[in-house]
């Protein structure tokens, strides 16, 4: 049995602020350290460590020498005793951090439960208390444990097994989901753009990155049939880990190849054609959110209810691309016939009925409901790939108890049809405040994702290139000390000499004067509601274009309603706000500052069930010239090259 011996080292004198997300940052440890070095011992009960404080590994428990507080004499503790201590004391003091870890009065905690509040750092010198570079520092409250990443023991394997799949799946699925959401105008942003990124736990993600090898590859192959056509789906993923100043970067290239294997590969796109679904079936598949529908317009129920006669043209009541939180067909309701109406419910509490046979309703259903399902399925796809990758890294392929569904070719096919022929990129950054009880620190997360397609005689290749970086915003000075933000005790960000972008139940999101692209996410001392908006609306941060479109079209609709049908016939008069026009105009992106050329991006697909997809809009072949083959990401200082792809070559 492989075992190890822990050495003793007194805690250093200095104690410095630890930036949670900075992996290479020189910091001093807090009041507790533990160290280990390789060795072997017999599997016997632990002896009393009188003068020689030695902690050991055994079959079930790992013992550590722990310095607690200012006591110079270490105490022997098992890992589970450490976690238990963290559960009973530290977690109770962290009760306000509800967005990161659920806490009750009698917490029972496992490694998986506390994974999201780890402070994890790879050491490049002795400043963090660990002796060699191959050791990693893991913090449980005020206790530091040094773990050799290459150690082949049950404790480290168990920790990797819990953290790595979770972190990698969050990175891949969240990044691609964010890319698709932004590509299609942040449609449904309440769930699927920046709010969609709430599922990403940066500390867990970076812990998983640290456990990954510097380079790794995985290839999966799966045969399937579409109408007696023999097809193959080939999924390949490559990971490259890069250390940068103050942080860590992981680059991933995921490739999907759809290949026709019979008939010499002719008409390979047959392998991408799956049966469409019916929007009414989707609505009936999901149970109603409540037992009522379309309350009578004259009855007060504590929140405003729009009349069923209201058309989608009256957008002054809501922002439809972000506010729809539930759509369903009423069941057993006398106000709305089951087979002809659908109920819409918004974040603000509006709800109303609309006829299913109206074009505006169908378009809206396809956009909002379909897009939400599309991102959900895409997220599961990338999670599946990440889990397979993590299993390979851990050398536990086929591990008993691990359930991973097969990669669905229908989802990959829908991605192929929906993404533009050109190379598309998103380059996003946002800030996250320290989620622990320590002094507040600020880290910046960069997510850069690009997609490209290439056609072959017998196959199609879809490539997703992702760069994920977390680094300290300021390596020498806390951002809050620069007075760009003022940090309140409960974790709320208050603006100082900056613009308040959004305020929700006492929580403010600020744009500092020095950076108009920053989004700050801070904890708040309240129980989070399921429909609570905790992220700033993305359209307000990136550009005002989407809001301008809505405002102009809303004015046009109101003038048209006021002046009658003849107003619509005016050559330069505002148009009536039809949903087709609304969707088309909303998904426009400027390529040039002079507005000469626009690239029309429309929602083109969704796949609400596992084995089906449907094209909602037929894409136009619009190209943005002079983009070149390389894209420069300023924060990484290098070019991202998509192989085999030339813009405008189709």
From Swiss-Prot:
GO terms for cellular component: membrane; viral envelope; virion membrane. It is a single-pass type II membrane protein. It is found in: Virion membrane. N-Glycosylated. Glycans are attached at residues 52, 290, 332, 338, 359, 422, 516, 552. The keyword Coiled coil does not apply. Signal peptide: none annotated. Residues 33-650 are virion surface. The chain crosses the membrane at residues 1-32. Keywords: Glycoprotein, Membrane, Signal-anchor, Transmembrane, Transmembrane helix, Viral envelope protein, Virion. It comes from the Viruses. Associates with the gp82-gp105 complex. This is Glycoprotein 105. The lineage of its organism: Viruses, Duplodnaviria, Heunggongvirae, Peploviricota, Herviviricetes.
């Amino acid at each position: 049995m492989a075992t190890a011996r822990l050495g003793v080292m007194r805690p250093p004198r200095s104690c410095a602020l630890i930036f949670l997300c900075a992996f290479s940052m020189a910091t001093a440890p807090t009041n507790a350290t533990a160290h280990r070095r390789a060795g072997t011992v017999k599997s016997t009960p632990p002896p009393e460590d009188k003068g020689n404080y030695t902690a050991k590994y055994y079959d079930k428990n790992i013992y550590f020498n722990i310095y607690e507080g200012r006591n110079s004499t270490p105490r022997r503790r098992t890992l589970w005793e450490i976690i238990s201590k963290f559960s009973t004391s530290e977690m109770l003091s962290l009760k306000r951090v509800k967005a990161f870890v659920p806490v009750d009065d009698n917490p029972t905690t496992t490694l998986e439960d506390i994974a999201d509040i780890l402070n994890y750092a790879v050491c490049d010198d002795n400043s963090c208390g660990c002796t060699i570079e191959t050791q990693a520092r893991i913090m449980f409250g005020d206790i530091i444990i040094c773990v050799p990443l290459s150690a082949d023991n049950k404790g480290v394997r168990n920790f990797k097994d819990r953290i790595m799949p979770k972190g990698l799946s969050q990175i891949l699925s969240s990044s691609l989901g964010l890319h698709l959401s932004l590509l299609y105008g942040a449609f449904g942003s309440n769930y699927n753009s920046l709010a969609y990124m709430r599922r990403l736990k940066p500390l867990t993600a970076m812990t998983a990155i640290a456990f990954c090898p510097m380079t790794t590859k995985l290839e999966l192959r799966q045969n399937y049939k579409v109408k007696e056509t023999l097809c193959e789906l080939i999924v390949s993923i490559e990971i490259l880990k890069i250390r940068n100043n103050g942080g860590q970067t992981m680059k991933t290239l995921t490739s999907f190849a759809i290949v026709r294997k019979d008939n010499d590969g002719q008409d390979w796109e047959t392998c991408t054609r799956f049966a469409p679904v019916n929007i009414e079936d989707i609505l009936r598949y999901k149970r109603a959110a409540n037992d009522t529908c379309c309350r009578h317009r004259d009855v007060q129920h504590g929140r405003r209810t729009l009349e069923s006669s209201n058309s989608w043209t009256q957008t002054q009541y809501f922002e439809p691309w972000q506010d729809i939180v539930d759509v369903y067909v009423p069941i057993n309701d006398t106000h709305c016939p089951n087979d002809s109406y659908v109920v819409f419910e918004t974040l603000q509490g509006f709800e109303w009925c609309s006829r299913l046979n109206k074009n505006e309703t169908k378009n809206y259903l396809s956009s909002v409901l379909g897009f939400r399902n599309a991102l959900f399925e895409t997220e599961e796809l990338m999670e599946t790939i990440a889990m397979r990758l993590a299993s390979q890294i851990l050398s536990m392929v086929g591990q008993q108890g691990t359930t991973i569904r097969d990669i669905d070719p229908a989802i990959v096919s829908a991605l192929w049809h929906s993404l533009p022929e050109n190379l598309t990129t998103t380059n996003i950054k946002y800030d996250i405040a320290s989620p622990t009880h320590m002094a507040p620190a600020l880290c910046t997360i960069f997510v850069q994702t690009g997609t490209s397609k290439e056609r072959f005689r017998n196959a199609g290749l879809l490539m997703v290139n992702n760069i994920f970086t977390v680094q300290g915003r300021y390596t020498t000075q806390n951002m809050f000390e620069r007075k760009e933000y003022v940090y309140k005790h409960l974790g709320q960000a208050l603006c100082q000499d900056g613009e308040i972008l959004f305020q929700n139940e006492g929580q403010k999101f600020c744009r500092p004067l020095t950076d108009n692209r920053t989004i700050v996410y801070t904890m708040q001392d309240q129980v989070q509601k399921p429909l609570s908006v905790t992220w700033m609306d993305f359209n307000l941060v990136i550009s005002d274009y989407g809001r301008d479109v809505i405002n102009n079209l809303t004015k046009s609709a109101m003038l048209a309603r006021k002046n009658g049908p003849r107003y619509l016939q005016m050559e330069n008069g505002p148009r009536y706000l039809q949903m087709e026009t609304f969707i088309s105009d909303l998904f426009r992106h400027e390529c040039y500052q002079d507005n000469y050329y626009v690239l029309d991006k429309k929602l083109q697909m969704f796949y609400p069930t596992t084995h089906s997809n449907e094209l909602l809009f037929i894409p136009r072949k619009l190209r943005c010239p002079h983009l070149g083959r390389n894209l420069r990401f300023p924060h990484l200082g290098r070019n991202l090259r998509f192989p085999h792809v030339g813009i405008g070559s189709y």
